[in-house]
Amino acid sequence: MNAVGALENHDLGALRAQSLLTTQEWSVADLDATRALARALADLDRRGIRTPLCPDELAWAVFFDQSTRTKSAWAGASSRLGMRPVIVDGSSTQVSHGETAVETGAMLGMNAHARGIRHDLILGEGNTFIRDVQQGIDDYLVATGDPRQVPIVNLQCDVDHPTQSIADLLWMEDNLGDLAGKKIAVSWAYSPSYAKPLSVPQGLITLLTRFGADVTLAHPEGYRLTEETMSAAESNAAGGGSFRVVDDMDEAFRDADVVY
């Protein structure tokens, strides 16, 4: 069965208007449907078949940190869907002058059909900010009787980088097949921006453990990830994979199928 035909096996309607704030909040069925849809859209794009599923809708993204790949991906994906991408620097918004996230959400909810936010520089703030923006949008739509639904996509925060983690999962499956029993080493070390890199390994250990992988997290002694994320990875691994933590890179990489 080709990628487009495989969509028959998934409930795509369940994805409609869903915000993606962390992969941990999505069911395995919805994650499966998302990857199937991504494969189908990529296949159609390679064959030159247009997919303007959201014609002339506004896809608004704001970045409070630097980005190359995610900005390009947001613009490319939304354009392929027929949307009009708008990408702004967070420092140019009124947030820099004291406007709250809820107020910003209400303002942007007046026009947007989809929102993307990157807010990853301060540990303990980014994901909360994104949720507050979502609340502002939802409150505005209810107060005005606007029938639109405006989902938010987390384009990297202090907790997770869900779009990158899902893309990494796709690549691994396309190259290795089923990840059950595959050994994956996830490493990370010091960065001048301490909070920023947390979201990448955290996103990987919480997502890959849900798909049966044997995940080893390697980092220098003392550089633990957040307790909530570590607990989630351990809980997810109980469903069929495994999760362990080491501070020795050689041990982590031994017999690994993937080194990240």
Summary of predicted features, one role per range:
Residues 1-76:
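Positively charged, low-complexity intrinsically disordered leader regions
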Residues 64-79, 173-260:
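Glycine-rich phosphate/diphosphate-binding loop of Rossmann-like nucleotide-binding domains
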Residues 44-48, 136-147, 175-178, 235-240:
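Alpha-helix termini
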Residues 27, 92, 159, 222, ...:
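Residue-level detector of flexible, active-site-proximal loop/helix-junction positions
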Residues 16, 54-55, 148, 180, ...:
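Residue-level preference for short coil/turn positions at secondary-structure junctions
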Residues 52-173:
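Phosphate/diphosphate ligand-binding glycine-rich loop within oxidoreductases
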Residues 30-37, 70, 104, 125, ...:
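General structural feature for long, well-ordered alpha-helical segments within catalytic domains
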